[in-house]
Each structure stands twice: as structure tokens, then as C-alpha cells.
A protein has these predicted regions:
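Regulatory N- and C-terminal appendages and interdomain linkers associated
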Residues: 1-30, 36-47, 57, 61-69, ...
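Active-site acidic catalytic loop and adjacent metal/ATP-binding pocket
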Residues: 26-40, 44-45, 49, 150, ...
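Conserved ATP-binding subdomain of kinase catalytic cores across diverse folds
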Residues: 33, 40, 47-168
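A glycine-centered beta->alpha junction motif in the catalytic cores
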Residues: 55-56, 113-132, 175-184, 304-305, ...
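Active-site catalytic-loop/activation-segment of kinase and kinase-like phosphoryl-transfer enzymes
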Residues: 107, 112-114, 148, 155, ...
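Intrinsic disorder/low-complexity segments
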Residues: 229-275
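Active-site activation/catalytic loop segments of kinase-like enzymes and analogous catalytic loops
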Residues: 285-332, 346-363
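All-alpha amphipathic helical-bundle segments outside canonical DNA-binding/catalytic cores
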Residues: 333-345
């Protein structure tokens, strides 16, 4: 229900000549409800309608979804002849008060700053190694332990699980949206459509698995994982963090520096000879989904970087890929993971094969990534031992 007292307080603040305000519900539909606002003023009666949206289904699941609908309404109602005009977009705050958020020309996010070395640096160094060293393994243990922990938070919602499946294929930031940013000639429209169709078929297979819904990061790729300098447990000396510029897979910029609150909130993982600390950036596209989203966001990069450097998946890259999956499954018992990753790998494969993000990739390297995507989609489950067969 709408907060009538807070709404009346907002109206009396915005319309100075109000004598009396009456609010009554007009009715409800499949998307939401409408409320009639009648204001008695010195110049007569003025009438308005407040519209609400239901909080689950039709892509209106999160408050930000509903805000986006209303902000677009406010901008565009006035641009169509004979259409009623929007007056404002109202937000109900934590304390119950109502304030205006309408009328902005653009919107920005103010956030904390973070420091460190993003995991892309480690992946680049893998090309110089035949096998992982102790710090490499500790970082993988730290990441898989972290994911196992956040993924243990479950939610019972068929709607939100199905939305994550739908968004993975159709969202503007996911498979179809990424393909739409490809320069013409990179991949034919038919080839793009074929990958999309296969991914849609996977949605039908995964819909019954809605019990998998869990808390996720949503964009757990190397550019969003910033490690602090690995510190020996025998020493309190730590080298200064190195600062790096923006990275290609991120939806935003790397933000530098760190507040005391961010330092306190850092995840500390790892046992044995080193403490491994990291901080995360750019959680994306909602708090709930399938753990496969986070797992593939990271592991596609072992495959991608190995293709860039070796033309196949081998050496420290294959070791990292195998260790990441095996450690995570050992921690969670989620053997089903291998049977659900395919459409998520399709999305992440489209990202790393994108010439806009990685213009230095050769045509042959892109072809290997697309073969991987198609062959994983064609298999009934992802098999680590077949990773190079998927490139063929």
C-alpha cells in the first residue's frame, strides 16, 4: 500500500496553496495499482493519479526496475500528442518519507574507492609459468571460498531464477546486447542467432532448476577482483598496492584509494603461508541468480587467456581452470554445476570474443572462442577434460 501520510506531506510541500488532500484507491491491475489524489486549493479542486507497480514479475522485481519504468514515463509522456503528462517520480525512503527523484537529465553513482591489483595481472603472468605457484593457488582458494560462502545464501523464487535465465540471454548487457555491439563482419547475424537460439533452448532445460537460486555477485570477472599484496603470515610488512587503469570487461572504471569502511569490509581468505585479501567492484544485474553466473564470469578467462597465449588451454591456465571448478564443487557439493553452465559460458564467451573489448585478438583466436561456445552449448554438460575438444 502507498504511504498516505508521507504522500500528503510531500504534496503540501510541493503545492503551497493546498487546503485539504484526499487519497483513495482507484483499483488494481496485473501490473500495479492507481490512487486518486484530490487536492482542495484556493483556486479550486486539482486531481492527480499516483501509479504503483507490483514488486515481482514482468521485470519489475527490484526497486530500481520500477524506478526505471517511471523515470522513462516521466520523460516520454509529454512527447506524445494527447497523452497525459507525468508530474514527478516519487521515492519512498527507509524512514517512510517521500521525496522526488524525477527530472534528472542524467544519473550517476557515488561509491567508495578501492585499491589493489586486479586479477587480470595474474592471468597475464600465467603465460610465463608451466604451473601455478603457492600464491596463485591461494588466490583461487580465496575466490572459491568466497563464492561458496555467498552462494550458500538461498532464496525461494521461481520468478527471480527465471529472470536471471532470461536476462543472461536477452538483457542489453548480456548475450544479445553484447552481440549488438559487435562490428559488422565479426560474426554473421545467422551465427549470432544460432548461439542465441541454443541458449534459449538451455533456458527451457534450466527452468525446473529454480531451487538453485542464490545470492551472487553478478559480474565476477578478473577486472572486478582486486587483490591486495599477498602478505606472509610471518611478516606484517606489505608492499604498497599498485594502481591500474580501467579494464575491458568491466562496465565501469577502476576506482582508486580506499576508505576505512572498505578496508574493514574486505574479504580475507587463505590459510598457510600467506594471507590473501581482496575487494570487489561492480556488482551487477541484481543480487540473485545461479552460481554458474559467477563461476563462468571468472573461469572463461582461463580459457580466453590461454587461447591468446597458446592457441589452446594448457599449462597454468588449464591447472587454474580445473582447480577453480574442483575446489568450488568440493566446497559446495554442487556437482550439478557442470550441467547448467552452458548458457552462461555463451554469454561470457561473447564478451571475451568482442572486438570492441579485445581488438588485438586474431580472427583465428575469435573462431576458437566461438567454437568453444557452440560445442559447450551442444553438449549435455560441461566436461573439464574435453575443454580442448570444445575448441575443435
Amino acid at each position: 500500500m502507498i504511504n498516505e501520510e508521507a504522500l500528503k506531506a510531500y504534496l503540501k510541500k510541493e503545492f503551497k496553496d493546498i487546503i485539504q488532500v484526499d487519497i483513495r484507491k482507484l483499483g488494481s491491475g496485473v501490473q500495479g495499482s492507481g490512487f486518486l489524489i484530490e487536492m482542495k486549493t484556493q483556486s479550486g479542486i486539482r486531481s492527480y493519479v499516483v501509479k504503483t507497480l507490483l514488486s515481482e514479475g514482468l521485470g519489475h522485481d527490484y526497486p530500481s526496475d520500477r524506478a526505471a519504468v517511471f523515470l522513462l514515463d516521466l520523460d516520454e509522456y509529454k512527447n506524445l500528442p494527447r497523452h497525459v503528462k507525468g508530474i514527478d517520480v516519487l521515492a519512498e525512503m527507509e524512514d517512510g518519507s517521500i521525496k522526488s527523484i524525477g527530472g534528472g537529465r542524467e544519473y550517476y553513482l557515488l561509491m567508495e574507492r578501492g585499491t589493489g591489483r586486479h586479477y587480470f595481472n595474474d592471468l597475464t603472468e600465467f603465460s610465463k609459468k608451466d604451473s601455478l605457484d603457492e600464491i596463485d593457488r591461494k588466490k583461487i582458494e580465496a575466490m572459491t571460498s568466497y563464492l561458496a560462502e555467498i552462494h550458500s545464501v538461498k532464496k525461494d523464487s521461481k520468478t527471480l531464477y527465471w529472470r536471471k535465465l532470461r536476462d543472461t540471454v536477452g538483457h542489453g548487457e548480456c548475450l544479445m546486447g553484447v552481440f549488438d555491439t559487435y562490428p559488422d563482419g565479426t560474426l554473421s547475424y545467422y551465427e549470432m542467432a544460432n548461439i542465441i537460439k541454443k541458449s534459449v533452448d538451455w533456458i527451457a532445460r534450466l527452468k525446473p532448476k529454480y531451487r538453485r537460486l542464490c545470492q551472487i555477485h553478478g559480474d565476477f570477472h578478473p577486472g572486478n577482483i582486486w587483490f591486495q599484496e599477498a602478505r606472509s603470515q610471518k611478516s606484517e610488512v606489505r608492499s604498497p598496492a599498485t594502481i591500474f587503469p580501467p579494464f575491458p570487461q568491466s562496465g565501469g572504471f577502476a576506482l582508486l584509494g580506499e576508505s576505512p569502511e572498505a578496508t574493514e569490509a574486505k574479504e580475507k581468505r587463505g590459510k598457510g603461508g600467506f594471507d590473501i585479501d581482496f575487494v570487489l567492484l561492480d556488482r551487477s544485474r541484481g543480487p540473485w541468480g545461479d552460481s554458474a553466473d559467477d563461476i563462468t564470469a571468472l573461469t572463461i578467462n582461463y580459457i580466453f587467456f590461454s587461447i591468446r597465449h597458446h592457441g589452446s588451454v594448457k599449462g597454468s591456465y588449464f591447472e587454474g581452470l580445473r582447480m577453480f571448478f574442483e575446489k568450488y564443487v568440493a566446497l559446495t557439493g554442487d556437482e550439478e554445476l557442470y550441467s547448467v553452465v552452458a548458457p552462461f559460458f555463451a554469454f561470457r564467451g561473447a564478451v571475451v570474443a568482442n572486438p570492441v573489448f579485445y581488438p588485438d585478438l586474431t580472427l583465428d583466436q575469435r573462431k576458437l572462442i566461438f567454437r568453444f561456445v557452440n560445442n559447450v552449448l551442444d553438449d549435455d554438460k560441461f566436461r573439464l577434460e574435453k575443454v580442448n575438444d570444445y575448441l575443435g
